[in-house]
Regions:
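Non-ligating segments of multi-cofactor redox enzymes
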Residues: 1-29, 35-39, 46-55, 62, ...
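A short glycine/small-residue-enriched secondary-structure motif
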Residues: 54-62, 70-76
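A compact, surface-exposed functional segment
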Residues: 65
Length: 194
């Protein structure tokens, strides 16, 4: 991994403004203290660390940032956001970058997107996460049907997986389904594949 940011790449001067407008964060105030990466639980799989992503946004390095694996590997745990001395919600910036990348058809880690859609499909149907349903959908979408099947007996023995989804009382699942439907309609209007 090369830690240097390649400044010879084409810059998009409007990119910084677009990220700041869409995320509601003043990325320009990041002074590269490194607090965001100090406790990042996913940083070990990043090709660019969070502070490098922020610097790339500041410099208008749109292609480098939107093609990065890091924006897809971010867990959205907000550890970075809580540690930022300038109160930049770095997790929100990463989310914004994922949306921008998807809108342009850039998906650096397709498996993550497949998992994301599998998770959202179970939430839409059942109103909350349904682990086995998410796993089955992900395995089918990624064509990795027997991946991690050997872990199932342990997970079942520890009661970490339920065969049936948990129910939500008082029409909660339907309400969540309506929210998800509105999201899909909005995404289509904005040109993003829901």
């Amino acid at each position: 991994m090369n830690d240097a940011i390649d400044l010879t790449r084409k810059r998009d001067r409007d990119f910084t403004a677009a990220v700041e407008a869409q995320s509601g964060q003043n990325v320009s105030t990041c002074y590269q203290c490194g607090n965001c990466l100090a406790g990042c639980p996913a940083g070990f799989v990043y090709d660019l660390q969070a502070n490098q992503i922020m610097r790339g946004v500041q410099l208008g390095l749109k292609d480098q940032v939107l093609n990065s694996r890091s924006i897809w590997m971010c867990l959205s745990c907000s550890t970075c956001s809580l540690r930022c001395p300038n109160n930049i919600d770095v997790a929100e910036v990463m989310e914004t970058l994922r949306h921008m990348a998807r809108k342009e058809g850039r998906v650096a880690v397709p498996k993550v997107e497949k998992f994301w859609f599998s998770f959202l499909d179970t939430v839409r149907k059942f109103g909350r996460t349904y682990e086995i349903g998410t796993m089955v959908l992900y395995m089918l979408r990624s064509l990795r049907v027997f991946t991690d099947v050997d872990l199932a007996p342990q997970a079942l023995a520890k009661q970490k997986l339920g065969f049936k989804p948990h129910s939500i009382p008082n029409g909660g699942a339907e309400a969540v389904g309506r929210i998800m439907t509105r999201y899909k309609e909005r995404a289509k209007r904005e040109g993003v594949r829901p």
